[in-house]
Swiss-Prot record:
Gene Ontology MF: a single term: anthranilate phosphoribosyltransferase activity
Named cofactor requirement(s): Mg(2+)
Keywords: Amino-acid biosynthesis, Aromatic amino acid biosynthesis, Glycosyltransferase, Magnesium, Metal-binding, Transferase, Tryptophan biosynthesis
GO biological process: L-tryptophan biosynthetic process
InterPro entries: Anthranilate_Pribosyl_Tfrase, Glycosyl_Trfase_fam3, Glycosyl_Trfase_fam3_N_dom, Glycosyl_Trfase_fam3_N_dom_sf, Nuc_phospho_transferase
Subunit annotation: Homodimer.
Transmembrane segments: none
Protein's gene: trpD
PANTHER family with a match to the protein in the record: ANTHRANILATE PHOSPHORIBOSYLTRANSFERASE (PTHR43285:SF2)
Protein name (database record): Anthranilate phosphoribosyltransferase
Gene Ontology CC entries for this record: cytosol
Catalytic activity as recorded in UniProt: N-(5-phospho-beta-D-ribosyl)anthranilate + diphosphate = 5-phospho-alpha-D-ribose 1-diphosphate + anthranilate
């Protein structure tokens, strides 16, 4: 199948959802050589990935994931694509703790750094979370603490082999888009930041095709986040309906911030910023977290709109609830000496 798919792509033809799924299955099963896998990824990138192709690939990623069981009906993910190259601190990871502190169950999917110096796994490890905790521990964290970290590299074993091909290619491929679409717990409520604005409507369409209950796909001022520095492009998906619009910080009741305020560093530096935000320090990092946590609360049904979400997120921080969720997650994932 993969040879047929490569030929189609080189002719500029789109694959159907089923065809894309067949190719991904072949790659996952080891039926494709590294050369074939690389040619497929490059040809697909050159043609441009469609909603159907991404949905078909995501179907297989979801099926092959090591499933994490969650008993709650509503739980969220704040995993973005990464790769925006802006080197901010870990905004969506911090927002996950704020959402948890506001009473929302969080199954946070994430990985090591893509283009930044600190991915979600890196900063969580620096904060004291055992990101390599086994699946049973992760499930217990989600149930008892209300937040758990789903480490992508551990929970998508079928696609370990493709990692070398991706590294050797050295360019973005469909896999840069698939991570946030393949939460191993099956989250149907999520905030998904993308590294380029052109992917906002595309991934909105993909989430609708995959049956998302309520989700926001966002890109703001070059960030795979809701921006407090300017305009954010949004695609909101709710029970099959898709709505596109833009928002500005003022719409959320937040001041406009300078991008330099959101700059991050390595995992240790970012961990300090996360800690300062959760301790209630005012400034650009807090406002960025409030904006993104607000969207998480809305998609979980815990806030009526983004302004209400900002107010509830602020209470989560200022009451100490968000900081307590981090403390509890560290304790729950730490093996006693």
């Amino acid at each position: 199948m993969i040879q047929h798919a490569i030929a189609k792509l080189l002719e500029g033809e789109d694959l159907s959802r089923a065809e894309a799924a067949q190719v991904m299955t072949e790659i996952a099963d080891g039926g494709a050589t590294p050369a074939q896998s690389g040619a497929f990824l490059a040809a697909l990138r050159m043609k441009g990935e469609t909603v159907e192709e991404i949905a078909g690939a995501a179907d297989v990623m979801r099926q092959r994931a090591d499933r994490v069981r969650v008993s709650r009906d509503v739980f969220i993910d704040t995993c973005g694509t990464g790769g925006d190259g802006r080197h901010t601190f870990n905004i969506s990871t911090t927002a996950a703790f704020v959402a948890a502190g506001a009473g929302v169950c969080v199954a946070k999917h994430g990985n090591r750094a893509v283009s930044s110096r600190s991915g979600s796994a890196d900063v969580l490890a620096a904060l004291g979370v055992n990101v390599d905790a086994d699946k049973e521990t992760v499930e217990r964290c989600i149930e008892e603490v209300g937040i758990g970290f789903l480490f992508a590299v551990r929970l998508h074993p079928a696609f370990k082999a493709i990692a070398g091909v991706r590294r050797e290619l050295g360019v973005r491929t469909i896999f840069n888009l698939l991570g946030p679409l393949a939460n191993p717990a099956g989250a149907r409520h999520q905030v998904l930041g993308v590294y380029e604005a052109r992917w906002v409507p595309v991934l909105g369409g993909v989430l609708a095709a995959l049956g998302a209950a309520h989700a926001f796909v966002v890109h703001g001022e070059g960030l795979d986040e809701i921006a407090v520095t300017g305009m954010t492009h949004v695609c909101e998906v709710k029970d099959g309906a898709v709505e596109r619009y833009t928002i500005r910080p003022e719409d959320l009741g937040l001041p406009r911030r300078d991008a330099a305020e959101l700059a991050g560093g390595d995992a240790a530096a970012n961990a300090r910023i996360v800690t300062h935000v959760l301790e209630g320090q005012q400034g650009g990092p807090r406002d960025a977290v409030l904006a993104n946590a607000a969207a998480a609360l809305v998609c979980a049904g815990a806030a009526t709109d983004l302004r209400d979400g900002v107010a509830r997120a602020a209470r989560s921080i200022d009451s100490g609830a968000a900081r307590e969720k981090l403390r509890q997650l560290v304790a729950a994932t730490t093996v006693p000496a």
